[in-house]
């Protein structure tokens, strides 16, 4: 599929980015790296304090960003804790959007085992949150079977219809555009209507990407980056997601019904560097390459 600079810039608009509470302490000013209103997800990692997630969400809101804190189901104690966290998120950080995930914990620490259990409490709606993200898995999950994933997508679509709430899927990071496009088409044909934010690995060394892929990546993406990492001489080479973005943009432009809507960046190579790259792509400050993909034009 062919793609134009306009296709890529259009697909890259309204991107979002991720930050950990620990990583946020190294960022002096979010406003220096991001345009006002940029969506920034704040993680709630296993073993971390959810109050740190709220504190960074408040800081982001104070700097004019749309803070989207994670709610990790299997890291919550009970409904009372969930209620308290949502109350704090909305009152202290003016949160109006959250991302609800299962969370990377083998054994739940409390009463919740899945995203749907959190959604079905009704507590998110109680606090006036109008937009909810849930996780998507284009390449499957090491913890959940494909059949279970299909059922979960069906349940989330039904929840969105029943509650009349804006629900979207945000995915793990990927490297293979064809795998993502095939997954999107398959879940759409199965009846899913949820818009999708695709996880994009920001520019980083192959060594760094391989490390994160070992933790999270499976399927085509893991094979792709493992092949790159075999060349020791290239381990410290910075790899950008230009071919992935071009491939996804081509697929989005070619299919008006495609559910892919936005890109969500994982800043593995640095927050400011990833934000600058995402902004350049969104602005169309790129040059198409003869063999596919593009390069960011020098300023």
What are these regions (language model features)?
Residues 147-160, 166-188:
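Hydrophobic, aromatic-enriched interface-forming segments
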Residues 2-153, 158, 270:
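Active-site beta->alpha loop and helix N-cap motifs at the rims of alpha/beta catalytic domains
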Residues 265-273:
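A short, acidic, flexible beta-alpha connecting loop/helix-capping segment that sits on the rim
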């Amino acid at each position: 599929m062919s793609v134009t600079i306009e296709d890529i810039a259009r697909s890259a608009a309204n991107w979002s980015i991720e930050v950990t509470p620990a990583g946020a302490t190294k960022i002096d000013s979010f406003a220096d790296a991001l345009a006002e209103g940029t969506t920034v997800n704040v993680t709630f990692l296993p073993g971390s304090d959810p109050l740190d997630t709220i504190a960074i969400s408040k800081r982001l809101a104070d700097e004019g960003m749309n803070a989207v804190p994670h709610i990790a189901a299997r890291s919550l104690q009970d409904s009372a804790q969930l209620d308290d966290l949502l109350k704090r998120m909305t009152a202290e950080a003016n949160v109006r959007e959250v991302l609800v995930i299962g969370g990377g914990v083998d054994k739940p620490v409390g009463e919740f085992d899945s995203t749907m259990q959190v959604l079905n409490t009704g507590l998110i709606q109680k606090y006036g949150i109008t937009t909810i993200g849930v996780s998507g898995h284009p390449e499957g999950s090491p913890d959940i079977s494909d059949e279970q994933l299909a059922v979960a997508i069906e349940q989330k679509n039904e929840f969105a219809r029943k509650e009349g709430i804006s629900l979207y899927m945000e995915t793990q990071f990927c490297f293979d555009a064809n795998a993502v496009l095939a997954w999107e088409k398959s879940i759409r044909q199965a009846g899913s209507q949820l818009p999708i934010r695709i996880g994009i690995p920001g520019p980083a060394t192959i060594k760094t990407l391989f490390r994160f892929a070992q933790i999270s990546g499976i399927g085509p993406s893991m094979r792709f980056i493992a092949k790159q990492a075999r060349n020791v001489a290239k381990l410290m080479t910075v790899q950008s997601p230009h071919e992935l973005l071009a491939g996804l943009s081509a697929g989005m432009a070619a299919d008006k019904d495609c559910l892919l809507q936005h890109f969500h960046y994982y800043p593995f190579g640095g927050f400011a560097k990833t934000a600058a790259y995402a902004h350049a792509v969104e602005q169309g400050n790129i040059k198409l390459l003869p063999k596919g993909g593009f390069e960011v034009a020098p300023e």
